[in-house]
Regions:
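Intrinsic disorder/low-complexity segments
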Residues: 5, 16-19, 43
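Exported/periplasmic ABC-transporter solute-binding proteins
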Residues: 33-78, 82-86, 92-109, 114-297
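Compositionally biased, intrinsically disordered low-complexity regions enriched in proline and serine
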Residues: 3-4, 20-21, 204, 292-293
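Composition-driven detection of intrinsically disordered, low-complexity segments
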Residues: 12, 17, 288-289
């Protein structure tokens, strides 16, 4: 598995192996219909928060197929689906299916709504979120009875992180524009922004949010429609804010890419997703970033 190169052009497939993941214990995996001596490579492109989880899965896959190489290009300005369409990559990791390309949901991710810990709010409704992020509600006093007469500080996410689109779809206004808000890219930048503004509100991937709370960040994960944001509620689908993690495949994807998809969908791959990717999160602290398997177990 190769270094992720933070450039806006695709790397060649012969880069060095990624070094920043703490090794997951390999989990036994049957061959799933592919030759034991599987050889070759595949290029995976993405730009969202799924990076470490997918790389951990790739590390497991390569352990059982040592003559293969799963290479990554992961950058904020990457265009995963476009690269697949242009035959520049085998797999695009995205947050939605594409009608014209083979698309498979491989896991789920919750989206946590976060506020500053000093803000007394604990729960919020979908309707309130929609009014806040559309600008109809502008003050915390309009959200809850004890709320201060203070303007709400909106912190939006960039369009290329697979988070904003499903969040706005949940609120019922895809591609909504015209609301003034601070824009942040990475999860840890969001936590820092929330920490620095008592009246702020934003949304992040559930795994990093749960880890941030565990690590002592001053953030509150709000109940949404009376459902607690936690691993089990995302897993069983009762928590309303969740999004798919999708593999969009090149129609001419390499045998290695196809075998990797089979592995991720296998019981062993889904178990690895449930365990979580042990690695270095974006703020360089040790963490466990979990996604949610498909079977709900």
């Amino acid at each position: 598995m190769q270094h992720v190169r933070n450039k806006t052009t695709l790397p060649k497939i012969n880069a060095l192996a990624a070094f920043y993941l703490i090794t997951l214990l390999p989990i036994g995996w049957p061959v799933l219909g592919v030759a034991e001596e599987l050889t070759g490579s595949a290029l995976i492109v993405g730009n969202g928060p799924e990076r470490y989880a997918i790389e951990a899965l790739a590390k497991n896959f390569e352990a059982f197929h040592p003559k293969t190489s799963l290479d990554f290009f992961w950058h904020q300005n990457a265009r995963p689906v476009e690269e697949v369409r242009e035959n520049g990559a085998d797999i695009a990791v995205t947050g939605q299916a594409e009608k014209d390309l083979p698309s498979t949901t491989v896991a789920w991710d919750g989206i946590a709504v976060v506020t500053n810990f000093s803000n007394a709010i604990e729960d919020i409704t979908r309707e309130q979120l929609a009014k806040i992020f559309s600008g109809e509600i502008r003050f915390w006093s309009q959200v809850y009875e004890e709320g201060p007469e203070a303007r709400i500080s909106l912190i939006h996410r960039t369009w290329n992180q697979n988070i904003r689109q499903p969040f706005e779809k949940f609120l019922g206004f895809e591609n909504h524009k015209g609301i003034r808000a601070k824009i942040v890219e990475k999860e840890n930048e969001t936590f820092k922004a929330i920490n620095g503004d008592i009246y702020s509100i934003s949304y992040v991937s559930m795994g990093p949010a749960l880890q941030a709370r565990k690590d002592g960040y001053g953030v509150t994960l709000l109940f949404v429609d009376d459902i607690e944001p936690e691993y089990q509620t995302v897993l069983d689908g009762t928590y309303p804010l969740r999004r798919p993690v999708v593999f969009v495949m090149n129609g001419n994807a390499s045998p290695v890419a196809q075998a990797f998809l089979e592995y991720v969908l296998s019981p062993q791959g889904q178990r690895a997703i449930k365990i979580g990717a042990s690695g270095l999160f974006q703020d360089k602290t040790s963490s466990v970033i979990k996604y949610y398997p498909l079977d709900g177990e």
